[in-house]
A protein has these predicted regions:
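Short, hydrophobic transmembrane alpha-helix segments
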Residues: 1-5, 23-26
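Interfacial juxtamembrane loops and adjacent helix segments
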Residues: 238-281
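Short, charged juxtamembrane terminal tails flanking transmembrane helices
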Residues: 346-350
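Alpha-helical membrane-protein architecture signal
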Residues: 221, 234, 269-277, 311-314
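Membrane-interface helix caps and helix-loop-helix hairpins in membrane proteins
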Residues: 49-55, 157-159, 209-210, 321-327
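Flexible juxtamembrane loops connecting transmembrane helices in multi-pass membrane enzymes
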Residues: 110-114, 171-172, 198-232, 243, ...
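Short, conserved phosphate/pyrophosphate- and ester-handling motifs at nucleotide-, phospho-/glycolipid
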Residues: 117, 217, 235, 328
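Alpha-helical transmembrane segments of multi-pass inner-membrane proteins
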Residues: 10-18, 38-46, 57-107, 113-182, ...
């Protein structure tokens, strides 16, 4: 069964169990985050009704139902966080066995985990990493935690995912900067400057690691920018990028703006390798505004910034700049779980 379909089936089963266990009075967690996220999802859902692929509507509704169930569930957050940390370790071990040849891959790439390419695999590892990093430990457990974190980092490097490597470094620096902010407060300018220089150097180095790939993405972004012009307010519609990109690319390559290197790099593209750009193209400025409203709600949730939920949301935000994480059901699950974990206010419904 495909993972996306399994995602929907799992939510239906979980929802049925929860409805069966609910008492006469239902407590619904309603706050600014709930309202803003619901409005954003509602807008995307309405847009999905005007497409021929109605399965998108099913995915969107399933995601919102999962958000409601998790917001109102009484499951232990610490236990679930530990499970996600274990999932990250097991996935990393699986990828390591693929790299060493003990498990064969059905792909051109040497490390893909249970995904179709390294991008999805690296994203799953990176999103589990904060839950392992934030685990409390001492003595021998501290050593095991360090080795497990190192395993995840090594496997992401072996996968060749440049976005994954960059995200791991950002999350690690952010975690320790927040955890030990009192110690580095006096020399914060030194540490901030050093961290910024390190990340800038890493970013430039990762670009030169695969220069053709980086140039190809820049070309995709330039062509994609042309898709925003016609319907900038409401967007071109859900799923429109796949249909509109290739004609727009042909138009760009035949113009005076394109050079020979652009014509060499051009190819068949189904995603702009930037989720924010995709949102602007398909949902327009309205979608961007509703997304920013949800982002404001996250920062107003009074949650500590060195928690795994916030660090995972940061990871998704970085991945969304250079890849296509929302292609995978696991990423949808993680962002919904993290949003549902933030502070909430209950309202009793009779």
């Amino acid at each position: 069964m495909p993972k996306n379909i399994s995602f929907v089936v799992g939510i239906v089963i979980w929802g049925g169990i929860c409805i069966g266990n609910w008492k006469r009075k239902i407590r619904l967690s309603v706050d600014f985050l709930f309202v803003s996220f619901t409005v954003f999802i509602g807008y995307v859902f309405v847009c999905s009704l005007f497409t021929s692929q109605y399965i998108h509507s099913v995915y969107i509704v399933s995601g919102w139902i999962l958000f409601v169930l998790m917001r109102n569930g009484k499951n232990s957050t610490e236990t679930f966080n530990s499970i996600l940390a274990a999932v990250g370790v097991l996935s990393a071990l699986y990828g390591l066995l693929q790299y060493t040849g003990y498990i064969e891959t059905q792909s051109y790439f040497s490390v893909t985990g249970s995904f179709d390419n390294p991008a999805g695999f690296a994203a799953s590892i990176v999103l589990c990493y904060p839950f392992l990093l934030c685990q409390t430990s001492n003595g021998k457990r501290k050593t095991l935690k360090f080795m497990a974190c190192l395993l995840l980092i090594i496997v992401v490097i072996l996968s060749g995912s440049r976005t994954g490597i960059l995200t791991l470094c950002v999350v690690t620096l952010l975690f320790y900067a927040l955890r030990y902010r009192k110690l580095i407060h006096r020399r914060r300018i030194f540490f901030i400057s050093g961290g910024a220089l390190f990340l800038i150097g890493l970013f430039i180095g990762l670009i030169y690691l695969k220069p053709a790939s980086a140039s190809g993405r820049v070309l995709i972004w330039k062509v994609s920018a042309g898709l925003c012009k016609e319907h900038i307010i409401q967007g071109n519609g859900l799923g429109s990028f796949k249909a509109d990109y290739m004609p727009e690319q042909a138009k760009y390559l035949s113009s005076s703006y394109a050079d020979e290197s652009d014509r060499i790099l051009a190819g068949n593209t189904n995603h702009p390798f930037n989720e924010y750009l995709l949102l602007l193209i398909e949902q327009g400025l309205i979608g961007i505004a509703l997304f920013l409203l949800s982002l404001i709600a996250v920062f107003r949730s009074n949650v500590v910034f060195d928690t795994p939920a916030l660090l995972t949301l940061v990871s998704i935000a970085i991945f969304s700049c250079f890849s296509y994480p929302f292609k995978y059901a696991f990423v949808w699950f993680m962002i919904i779980y993290c949003l549902a974990s933030l502070n909430q206010r209950e309202v009793a419904l009779r």
